[in-house]
Amino acid sequence: MSEINAGFAPAETDVAASGDDLLGRTLDRIPFSVYHLLLVVILGLVGFVEGYDTAITGALLVLARGPLHLTAADTPWLVVVPTAAVVASVFVGSLLNDRFSRKNLMQFGIVVTTLFTLLIPLAETADQLIALRILGSIGVGFAIPAAYPIGAELLPAQHRRTFATIYELVLATAFVLLPFLGFLLAHNPDGFRLIALPGGLALFVVPVLVHFIVPQSPRWQLSRGRAGAAAATVNWMIARAGGAIAALDPAVLTRGPARASAALPPYAALFRAGQLRFTIVGVLCGVSSTVAYYIFAFLLPRALEAQGAAVSLSFGLSSLLFLATLPGKVLVGFLMEAIGRRWTILFALLGAVPGLLLMAIAHLTGNLAAIVFSIGALITGMTVLSSFPATRMYLSEQFPTALRGRGHFLGETVARLLGGVVAPFLLAPYIGSPVIFFGSVLIVVAIGALPPLLYGKETVGQLEGVARTGAPAGAPSA
């Protein structure tokens, strides 16, 4: 535990604190206020956009099958290809991030995603639906990975778990809402049109709130040599939070290394000695949970139907699985500060093994199958599907400010490529086999639990240490 608590040690021991330290220290000293809570909720709505865009795939596979005459050949086009578009756009975003405003990239992505979701009710053929899903998925790649670097850089150290937890809770509501709406609309021929409206209508709400409530990241502004803009942003946040501390003098932010060119380190810096180990660990920590996330969001309703469940029951069990993530993410949010990111990730991933086993063998229990599956779904929902507050924040904390956006986007690219493209493509032919379907997820989750604990370092409260050293504070060079 001393390793964890060391992350909260003040930086005043520095002989001459740099501008990065002073800015970070000032942000951490702003008392948590209604403004901070509003900021967290607005970023959480971005999570709703992500959750709705992902979870709607499973609903569309069922609800649009009759009205649009979807065939088995259309499944990869609705599941794999849009996710491949997300991966491609995340990678493009990783090249642009750190160089351009995280907020502006996020706004672009939100508008594109919600616009094409809003157009889904107009689809008259399977090809039109597929095209809209692919175009909307391009926006997801720009919007979603930006939220965690922004949250990590705006929130005081002790409240980053607050952001991560609320963000993931709002995201989880989309996964609970979609199967529930699918259950209600299961026999409505226009069900696939109606179910797209909540995600599409967010176009008129979320971008407006982000524009007026979420500031540019002052840490990013300072990393680009804009000390005056960084100080102005911090002082704006101080005023919005009640003005409880003194304003920040822009002059103090020029301390430390010269920023004449404000040149960014190259993308290759993510793989240099001293950073490579933490890049790999940060990327790997989210892959297992992302595989489970996408498999269940995309294929679970269809898999349960293929395994003999009624359409309404398949939606009901899927909704139960994601409903369990609401208390699960609160628990993970508490644990990630109490016992650290790494031990929390281990708990969340290994804790899912019993639940996945129960879901895999539920079909063997006769009349008790629904009960056994429900127990397994509750366990799995409260563990691996609730791990994202820890895994995503841990990923963002692996990188210094000048690499954070690109590093986080890289992690999201790899996780979504493996979880949202490769895994569904490989498992889609076997959705009728409970042992193969759930057993494959179990193996991936069990293997992925160990790298952060064995090779990673604790990062709680060490964002400025990462900014100085390029690796989590106290970590030896690779």
Report each predicted region and the residues it spans.
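Intracellular cytosolic loops and amphipathic helices of Major Facilitator Superfamily
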Residues: M1-R29, H211-G274, Q462-A478
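Extracytoplasmic gate region of multi-pass secondary transporters
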Residues: T57-G58, F271-K329
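Helix-breaking motifs and short loop linkers at transmembrane-helix boundaries and internal kinks
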Residues: H69, S101, L122-Q128, P156, ...
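Conserved MFS/SLC helix-loop-helix module at the cytosolic interface between two early adjacent transmembrane helices
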Residues: A88-A126
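Helix-to-loop junctions at the C-terminal end of transmembrane segments
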Residues: V90-S101, K329-R341
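C-terminal ends and interior cores of transmembrane alpha-helices
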Residues: V111-E124, F183, G351-G366
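Glycine-rich segments within core transmembrane alpha-helices of 12-TM secondary carriers
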Residues: R161-H187, L197, L201-L203, E412-V422
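C-terminal transmembrane helical hairpin of 12-TM major facilitator-type secondary transporters
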Residues: G340-T391
